[in-house]
């Protein structure tokens, strides 16, 4: 059993038959060795108890009920005074029933069977190691032809080297005639080979270091060859070089991990623990079982039949033995990856059986659904939308999601503040959505961060912490600056929200995972919170108003129609372009819909007179009755007195530019205020505003 405190990683790879035997076999206190599943039965139809040596045998996998054997006897678990520790009548140990979740069994195969993953999957490891075509190896595995087995210093009946095709008519019909079953088996074991046994023999004879040396020599020879000028030949040479590189890398991996290639052919087939392939009783006569149990039953049936043909029968035709070996190979293929070799195995209702590959792989497989992306409590999921008014470290959480995630916290505070007498009353107030519930929820959210995650989580910025704010609707609101870290956009992406419960998790969220603390990329150090997509479009729209200069706008008749207000009769003249003393007046006029976002206006500004070019001539000069006059330039206006003193300076701008300037100014002030506070003691820090 895997202990999460002692095992920090999980590695999937090939195992030896000895390791499978170690996992499955166990020695009972009386010295009897159990672990092999020999019967294709599950439960007895009368007693409704597991069959002995079957797929749910209690001797092999442990008791169904803790401390109770198949006979019904009871022992206290962990009591060393209780003796014996197993039932002498049925052979079942008095242990915890949880052992049935990890105790395995095994099936001893009558003939070696090829593991189909390493033959049919891409890349095919068998093809890479043996350097033979895939169709040739498939015919060999599924008994399509024989492989002549040369024996040194011994006379052989078949004086052939290489492949002896089974489909050749003389051999197909003449060889079985001269031999009985046992004689033919002896002949085949001595001079012929087919099926998974032939692959296993070739893999066992491989010298991995010689493979690396020969492949390297051949690769160097191909590398030194010049181009032939024939595109097809050059591609063929390139594919061969790539194959040699893969072959050398695979051989090095086998050597580095101390794995023998012959382990890719199975002699012992592991049987999963019963709790991972359960059977449920619906009614007295109806059972619901896992598909894996049905495939195991077929494997045991075919394996027992082949064992009987090889051990007991004398005059069984050789073709029947070969056919049974092929059926056994196909049954094991269906267990590992149903349908990978052609027609999948089906039940009586023409439904395809679900194999181990189907259970493991895919989005709903055991790895991604249970181990990597396991569903957890205190979590939710929704679509994300933009929240431009949010702070960088805040997110908008829908009320419906927030009340479900923080329901336990709300109930606690309702009882603590004597607003509810018990849990039932508190839940009733939550269902009625009373105002006090939302007030308490907001108080909780002000001090409790949440984690937002967008799959796939490829780097640490794929999950960040935020302080939630209650929003209407059902969508999670997100600041657009944090989208790059999540690799998210607002075209229907979904994000998951999690609530850190322990103090350690909340401290980690606050100190390490807040979004405003992850502004730089952890890989290259570049800013990760940069304006993109919607923000750039918004900045463009905000600053794309009529600000091209008074000459272009007023005196160019071709452009005049492009710079008009919503009123078609509106034309930019001095009287129609309003003057404002400050930005607040301009914003107020916009809210009263007296000006547009891109309408040009004159704003009084404290402009440094040194930046005004002395040699620049005004475009127009307007004189007033009191002697003051206006000098109008391309982008600014100067109001002078009779004595030519500068009274006011106005700049020609738009409300969009004013808004952008105010945001930048507030951000700079906040930055310097934060830097200033960080240098002061905590007791004299200045609060913003």
Curated annotation (Swiss-Prot):
Q: What class of enzyme is it?
A: transferase
Binding of Mg(2+), residues: 489, 491, 493
The enzyme's E.C. designation: 2.7.7.6
Which InterPro entries does the record match to this protein? DNA-dir_RpoC_beta_prime (IPR045867), RNA_pol_asu (IPR000722), RNA_pol_N (IPR006592), RNA_pol_Rpb1_1 (IPR007080), RNA_pol_Rpb1_3_sf (IPR042102), RNA_pol_Rpb1_clamp_domain (IPR044893), RNApol_RpoC1 (IPR034678)
How many and how are cofactors bound here?
Binds 1 Mg(2+) ion per subunit. Binds 1 Zn(2+) ion per subunit.
Q: Where in the cell is it found?
A: Plastid, Chloroplast
Broad class of where this protein is predominantly found: plastid
List cofactor names only. Answer: Mg(2+); Zn(2+)
Which molecular-function annotation in GO is an example for this chain?
DNA-directed RNA polymerase activity
Identify the keywords attached in UniProt to this record, alphabetized.
Answer: Chloroplast, DNA-directed RNA polymerase, Magnesium, Metal-binding, Nucleotidyltransferase, Plastid, Transcription, Transferase, Zinc
Q: Give a Pfam family name.
A: RNA_pol_Rpb1_1
Q: How does it assemble?
A: In plastids the minimal PEP RNA polymerase catalytic core is composed of four subunits: alpha, beta, beta', and beta''. When a (nuclear-encoded) sigma factor is associated with the core the holoenzyme is formed, which can initiate transcription.
Q: What does this protein do?
A: DNA-dependent RNA polymerase catalyzes the transcription of DNA into RNA using the four ribonucleoside triphosphates as substrates.
Q: Which family, according to UniProt?
A: Belongs to the RNA polymerase beta' chain family. RpoC1 subfamily.
This chain belongs to the protein called DNA-directed RNA polymerase subunit beta'
Record lineage = Eukaryota, Viridiplantae, Streptophyta, Embryophyta, Tracheophyta
């Amino acid at each position: 059993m895997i202990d999460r405190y002692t095992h920090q990683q999980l590695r999937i790879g090939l195992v030896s038959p000895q390791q499978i035997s170690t996992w499955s076999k166990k020695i009972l206190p009386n010295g009897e060795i159990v672990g092999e599943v020999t019967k294709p039965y599950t439960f007895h139809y009368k007693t409704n108890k597991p069959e002995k040596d079957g797929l749910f045998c209690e001797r092999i996998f442990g008791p169904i009920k803790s401390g109770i054997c198949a006979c019904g006897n009871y022992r206290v678990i962990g009591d060393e005074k209780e003796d014996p520790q197993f039932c002498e009548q049925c052979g079942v140990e008095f242990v915890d029933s949880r052992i049935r979740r990890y105790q395995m069994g095994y099936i001893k195969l009558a003939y070696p069977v090829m593991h189909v993953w390493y033959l049919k999957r891409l890349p095919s490891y068998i093809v890479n190691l043996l350097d033979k075509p895939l169709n040739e190896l498939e015919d060999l595995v599924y008994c399509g032809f024989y492989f002549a087995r040369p024996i040194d210093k011994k006379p052989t009946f078949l004086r052939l080297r290489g492949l002896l095709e089974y489909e050749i008519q003389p051999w197909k019909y003449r060889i079985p005639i001269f031999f009985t079953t046992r004689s033919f088996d002896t002949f085949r074991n001595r001079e012929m080979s087919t099926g998974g046994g032939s692959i296993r023999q070739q893999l066992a004879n491989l010298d991995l270091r010689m493979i690396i040396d020969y492949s390297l020599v051949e690769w160097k020879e191909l590398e030194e060859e010049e181009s032939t000028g024939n595109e097809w030949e050059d591609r063929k040479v390139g594919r061969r070089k790539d194959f040699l590189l893969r072959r050398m890398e695979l051989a090095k991996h086998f050597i580095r991990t101390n794995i023998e290639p012959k382990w890719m052919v199975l002699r012992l087939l592991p049987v999963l623990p019963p709790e991972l392939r359960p059977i449920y009783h619906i009614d007295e006569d109806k059972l619901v079982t896992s598909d894996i149990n049905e495939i195991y039953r077929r494997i045991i049936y075919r394996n027992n039949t082949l064992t009987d043909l090889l051990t007991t029968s004398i005059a069984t035709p050789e073709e029947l033995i070969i056919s049974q070996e092929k059926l056994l190979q196909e049954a094991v293929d269906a267990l590992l990856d149903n349908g990978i070799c052609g027609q999948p195995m089906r039940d009586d209702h023409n439904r395809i059986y679900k194999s181990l590959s189907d259970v493991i792989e895919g989005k709903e497989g055991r790895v991604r659904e249970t181990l990597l992306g396991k569903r957890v409590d205190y979590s939710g999921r929704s679509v994300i939308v933009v929240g431009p008014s949010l702070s960088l470290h805040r997110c908008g959480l829908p009320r419906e999601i927030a009340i479900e995630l923080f329901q336990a916290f709300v109930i606690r505070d309702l009882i603590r503040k004597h607003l509810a007498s018990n849990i039932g009353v508190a839940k009733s107030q939550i269902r009625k959505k009373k105002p006090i519930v939302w007030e308490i929820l907001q108080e909780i959210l002000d001090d409790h961060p949440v984690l937002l995650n967008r799959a796939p989580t490829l780097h640490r910025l794929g999950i960040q912490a935020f302080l939630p704010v209650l929003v209407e609707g059902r969508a999670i609101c997100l600041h657009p600056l944090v989208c790059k870290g999540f690799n998210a956009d607002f075209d229907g992406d979904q994000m998951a929200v999690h609530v850190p419960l322990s103090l350690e998790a909340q401290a980690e969220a606050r100190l390490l995972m807040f979004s405003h603390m992850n502004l730089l990329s952890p890989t290259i150090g570049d800013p990760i919170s940069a304006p993109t997509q919607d923000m750039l479009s918004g900045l463009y729209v905000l600053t794309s108003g009529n600000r091209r200069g008074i000459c272009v706008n007023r005196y160019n008749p071709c452009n005049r129609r492009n710079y008009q207000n919503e009123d078609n009769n509106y034309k930019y003249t001095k009287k129609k372009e309003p003057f404002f003393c400050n930005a607040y007046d301009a914003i107020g006029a916009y809210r009263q819909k007296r000006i547009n976002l891109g309408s040009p206006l004159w704003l009084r500004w404290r402009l440094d007179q040194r930046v005004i070019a002395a040699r620049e001539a005004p475009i127009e000069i307007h004189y007033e009755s009191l002697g003051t006059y206006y000098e109008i330039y391309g982008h600014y206006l100067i109001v002078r007195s009779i004595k030519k003193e500068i009274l006011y300076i106005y700049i020609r701008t738009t409300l969009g530019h004013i808004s952008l300037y105010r945001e930048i100014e507030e951000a700079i002030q906040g930055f310097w205020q934060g830097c200033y506070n960080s240098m002061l003691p905590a007791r004299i820090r200045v609060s913003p505003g």
